[in-house]
A protein has these predicted regions:
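Short, conserved structural micro-motifs that define repeat-unit consensus positions
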Residues: 79-86, 151-155
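Short glycine-enriched nucleophile-adjacent loop
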Residues: 155-166
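Conserved alpha/beta-hydrolase
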Residues: 92-115
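Alpha/beta-hydrolase fold nucleophile elbow
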Residues: 141-152
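Short beta-strand element of the alpha/beta-hydrolase
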Residues: 72-80
Length: 168
């Protein structure tokens, strides 16, 4: 039995080219649904779901939103180095079961976001993405309290923000 390389199974370029701004409330496209299916996400009744982007300092940042009808809080999820938000299905499902809205972003150079693969010039670039994600959450009217969850590099971004920035 031979293994088929992942690159032959899922090609992200057409999906990336078709993404719309996160703020647009359009239903998921066929390419977006295929991406979600590839990573094991099952559509949920009574949960609005979006996959889109927002711009930060020349990067087009891919973001995913899941919003139940009456969420009790919001979880902002930041992945680790060489990861992307599609790999965090179990955390996202846990948060949805707990009644949270979830906003998950792909860091620059990761997943569906633009930028050289897994490479930034300065850690401050990640801080700019976090601040922009928080602004997106606010603009989308995601409910407080906001909970932050980061794994590895994502956790370091959150700790740096909490220690050195003015949290919202």
């Amino acid at each position: 039995e031979s293994m088929v390389p992942m690159s032959e199974i899922f090609q992200p370029e057409p999906l990336v080219a078709s993404l719309r701004p996160l703020a647009s409330a359009a239903p998921l496209s066929a390419a977006e649904l295929a991406y979600r299916q590839f990573y094991g996400f099952v559509p949920r009744e009574a949960v609005e779901s979006r996959l889109g982007w927002f711009e930060v300092d020349g990067y087009r940042i891919a973001a995913q939103l899941w919003q139940p009808i009456a969420p009790r809080a919001t979880l902002l999820l930041l992945h680790g180095y060489y990861d992307h938000s599609g790999l965090y299905r179990h955390v996202i499902e846990w948060a949805l079961e707990a009644g949270f809205a979830v906003l998950a972003v792909d860091l620059p150079g990761h997943g569906l976001s633009s930028g050289p693969r897994a490479s930034i010039s300065d850690f401050a670039e990640y801080q700019a993405v976090l601040r922009a994600a928080l602004q997106q959450a606010d603009a989308l009217g995601l409910p407080a309290p906001w909970h932050l969850c980061g794994q590895s590099t994502g956790g370091a971004i959150l700790i740096d923000y909490l220690l050195n920035d003015q949290p919202l």
